[in-house]
């Protein structure tokens, strides 16, 4: 039986480990035990270990028997963990939301004859997969992705609960958003171009620019592309207030002789406020719009994903949609169906029609289904 080491045992990492344990021998490695998820892992006889994942020698020792690595750590250490896995000579599928350019590691991965799939969540991830598939079949001229995970129950003040690492949520709110307009990369302020839209079956949500295009700015030669994140109306005004007051600044300030970064303080305060309640009913929604010319005719493809908390398994919709996209890619590598070497964002997988269909079927078998509308324009 092939062995997989999952680096990171939080909400996403544990969901990934549980899914992969159905077919493989899995071990979860993290800095400290996450009691919220570790009990379930032990019930399923999934091995766990504690380690500083930024320590190369220690990590390399722990993963030396693994056939594949899963990177599921917070973004601020994600790039280093990815680099360490490649340095250790391991294929990897990574979901971490790090700010660094993953293609910096392409030469090392190619030299070691490794496959390193990055940004392999829901968005970026599944969204890239879909775009890569259609970009191979048509001349895409416009791409837009709207995505968000929210609780059904709206509770003030934020009407939000973090479906992944809170520090990564803050990073999403503070990182300048890169868009493609008329063939040129344009950098816009985070949270900019706020607009309302109607989402079935939820109702009115607001959306704003976020830096989710990432690798497709380099890999997809499409003149107009943007990604926006969804929240309940009014949420972003509260985030902007905190931003304007300096709570998300990363430069240290002195308080009673102690140095502290405002962003670390804010994350500490917001963590319990944004913490998901046990068995909280929540949903993930994603809408993708692709326009261009297919076989010489103007065509539009619209995909809609609506997934909600799985009461039977206790798995959140964000963990399902992110995690099972990741496990689908992992199976392709382990079964030697996706063989490209180097840094491989999900759009590369989507360009292979068989691989695209395999992952879509993998998701459908886990009751994650996308509605696809195709029409002439």
Residues covered by each model-derived region:
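Conserved N-terminal Rossmann-fold NAD(P)-binding element of oxidoreductases
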Residues: 4-8
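Hydrophobic/small residue at the entry helix of a nucleotide-binding pocket
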Residues: 12
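Conserved Rossmann-fold cofactor-binding substructure of NAD(P)-dependent oxidoreductases
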Residues: 54-64
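ADP-ribose/adenylate-binding Rossmann-like module
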Residues: 84-102
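Rossmann-fold NAD(P)-binding glycine/threonine-rich loop
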Residues: 96-116
């Amino acid at each position: 039986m092939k062995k997989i080491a999952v680096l990171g045992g939080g909400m996403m990492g544990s969901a990934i480990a549980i899914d992969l344990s159905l077919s493989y021998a899995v071990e979860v490695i993290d800095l400290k035990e996450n009691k919220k998820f570790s009990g379930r892992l032990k019930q399923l006889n999934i091995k766990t270990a504690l380690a500083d994942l930024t320590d190369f020698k220690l990590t390399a020792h722990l993963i030396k028997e693994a056939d594949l690595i899963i990177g599921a750590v917070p973004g601020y250490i994600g790039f280093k963990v990815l680099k360490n896995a490649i340095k250790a000579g391991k294929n990897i599928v990574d979901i971490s939301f790090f700010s660094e350019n993953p293609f910096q590691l392409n030469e090392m991965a190619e030299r070691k004859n490794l496959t390193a799939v990055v940004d392999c969540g829901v968005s970026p991830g599944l969204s890239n997969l879909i775009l890569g598939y259609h970009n191979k079949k048509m001349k895409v001229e416009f791409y837009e992705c709207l995505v968000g995970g929210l609780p059904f129950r709206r509770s003030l003040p934020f009407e939000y609960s973090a479906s992944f690492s809170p520090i990564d949520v803050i990073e999403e709110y503070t990182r300048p958003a890169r868009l493609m307009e008329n063939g040129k990369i344009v950098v816009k302020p985070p949270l900019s171009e706020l607009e309302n839209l109607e989402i079935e079956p939820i109702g009115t949500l607001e959306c704003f620019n976020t830096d989710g295009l990432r690798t497709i700015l380099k890999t997809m030669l499409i003149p107009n592309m943007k990604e926006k994140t969804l929240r309940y109306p009014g949420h972003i005004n509260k985030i902007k207030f905190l931003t304007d007051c300096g709570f998300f600044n990363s430069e240290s300030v002195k308080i009673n002789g102690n140095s502290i970064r405002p962003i670390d303080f804010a994350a500490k305060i917001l963590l319990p406020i944004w913490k998901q309640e046990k068995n909280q009913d929540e949903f993930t929604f994603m809408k993708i719009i692709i326009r261009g010319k297919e076989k010489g005719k103007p065509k539009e493809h619209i995909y809609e994903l609506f997934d909600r908390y799985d009461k039977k398994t206790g798995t959140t919709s964000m963990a399902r949609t992110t995690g099972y996209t990741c496990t689908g890619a992992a199976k392709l590598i382990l079964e030697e169906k996706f063989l490209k070497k180097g840094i491989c964002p999900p759009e590369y997988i989507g360009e292979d029609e068989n691989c695209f269909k395999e992952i879509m079927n993998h998701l459908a078998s886990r009751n994650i289904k996308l509605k696809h509308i195709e029409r002439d324009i």
